């Protein structure tokens, strides 16, 4: 009889970057918040996370990844529920901060080798696509960038190219 091999899931440092610009108003921001809360619920006990929101500027819940302990995850979910959509779309600075933060953290500082991931949640309605793509190409290092397209017509072309540059995948969340 064949025995099932169960490998331990590697610990992850996940930085979620969420678009809260004006183009995300209405259903899009609600979808993005729901997706982010689902992702937070799927973090494992050895994972760490960080959330960066961006519109005209960017801000983060914590400056570095924090352990995915129940208390921190609940605090993050409350933060996400309170996000609103307004303002411009300055994506480059937010992604710069995410990639810098990913590489500032020692991936083995708790004795574990960690997968470093950036998850970009946006409708892709940005003006500086070329700068974004060259930033990802230049700074991704050994991290991976995944894109999640939100809204009725996300910029799938940009999202696919950004995910490819980050050696990740693009997922489109269809409007209900």
Feature-to-residue mapping (PLM):
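Exposed acidic/Ser/Thr-rich ligand/metal-binding surfaces
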Residues: 1-176
């Amino acid at each position: 009889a064949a025995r099932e091999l169960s490998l331990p899931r590697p610990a992850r440092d996940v930085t979620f970057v969420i678009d809260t610009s004006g183009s995300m108003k209405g259903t899009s921001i609600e979808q993005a918040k729901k997706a982010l809360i689902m992702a937070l619920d799927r973090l494992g006990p050895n994972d760490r996370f960080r959330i960066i929101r961006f519109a005209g500027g960017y801000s983060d819940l914590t400056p570095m990844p924090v352990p995915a302990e129940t208390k921190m995850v609940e605090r993050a979910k409350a933060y996400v529920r309170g996000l609103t959509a307004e303002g411009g779309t300055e994506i480059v600075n937010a992604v710069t901060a995410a990639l810098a933060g990913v590489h500032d953290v020692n991936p083995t500082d708790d004795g574990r080798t960690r997968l470093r991931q950036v998850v970009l949640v946006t409708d892709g309605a940005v003006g500086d696509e070329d700068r974004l793509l060259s930033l990802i190409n230049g700074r991704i290092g050994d991290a991976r960038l995944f894109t999640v397209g939100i809204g009725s017509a996300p910029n799938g072309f940009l999202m696919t190219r950004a995910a490819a540059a980050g050696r990740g995948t693009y997922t489109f969340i269809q409007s209900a």
